[in-house]
C-alpha cells in the first residue's frame, strides 16, 4: 500500500536493524485518515472471504481493526493483555511474547464475542516473529471459530512471522512489507498485485 509505505518513509524511524518506530501515526498517535485508508484496503483484500468478525490485540491493533470492521460492516473484538475484574469467565487464553517489550503476556478473549463457526479475520499492527498473530489465531480456534485470514499493517519480512503463519495454512495480507531497516533508510519488499 503506497500511502502507508510513504508514511513510514516520512515519519517512521529505524531504531536498529530490528526495530521500526511508527509512534507518529500508528501505535501512540494515530492518523485517522491513514487508518480509514487501511480499513478500506483490508476490506478490499478480504472482500471474498465472507468474514463474520475481526479479532485484534490491544492496543495498537484497535484502530486498524475498527476501521476495517466499519468498512466491512461487521463487529470486531480485541483480546486483552491483562485480565480485569470484568473479564473473568469463559475465556480463551494464549501466551504471547512481545519482542518490542521483551515480555510475555497472557492474552484473553471472551467466548461470548467469538462464536463457533464464525469466519474471523485477525488484524495486527506488526508482524515480526509471528507471536502475536499466532496467539490470536489460537484464541479464535479455541473459541471454535475459523481463521479466514491474517491482515498485517506492517510486516518485517526479514523475520519469520509470515513463514510461521503460512506453514500453518493461514492467508496473510500485509499492507507494507519492510525488507530492511538501516539508520536513515527503510526499504520495502516490492509486491506485484
Swiss-Prot record:
- Does this entry carry the keyword Cytoplasm? yes
- List the catalysed reactions: XMP + diphosphate = xanthine + 5-phospho-alpha-D-ribose 1-diphosphate
**Enzyme class, broadest EC rank:** transferase
Cellular location(s)? Cytoplasm
Q: Where does 5-phospho-alpha-D-ribose 1-diphosphate bind?
A: 128-132
Annotated InterPro entries: PRibTrfase_dom, PRTase-like, Pur/Pyrimidine_PRTase, Xanthine_PRibTrfase
Principal localization reads cytoplasm
Q: Which family does it belong to?
A: Belongs to the purine/pyrimidine phosphoribosyltransferase family. Xpt subfamily.
Relate the protein's function as given in its record.
Converts the preformed base xanthine, a product of nucleic acid breakdown, to xanthosine 5'-monophosphate (XMP), so it can be reused for RNA or DNA synthesis.
Gene Ontology CC: one annotated term: cytoplasm
One example of the protein's molecular function in GO is: xanthine phosphoribosyltransferase activity
Which EC number applies? 2.4.2.22
Checking HAMAP family in the record gives:
XPRTase
The protein depicted here goes by the name: Xanthine phosphoribosyltransferase
Q: What PANTHER family does its record include?
A: HYPOXANTHINE/GUANINE PHOSPHORIBOSYLTRANSFERASE, XANTHINE PHOSPHORIBOSYLTRANSFERASE
The UniProt annotation places xanthine binding at: 20, 27, 156
| UniProt pathway annotation | Purine metabolism; XMP biosynthesis via salvage pathway; XMP from xanthine: step 1/1
A Pfam family name for this chain?
A: Pribosyltran
CDD domains with a match to the protein in the record: PRTases_typeI
Q: What are the coiled-coil residue ranges?
A: none
Q: Which UniProt keywords apply?
A: Cytoplasm, Glycosyltransferase, Purine salvage, Transferase
GO annotation, biological process: purine ribonucleoside salvage; xanthine metabolic process; XMP salvage
Q: Assembly and partners?
A: Homodimer.
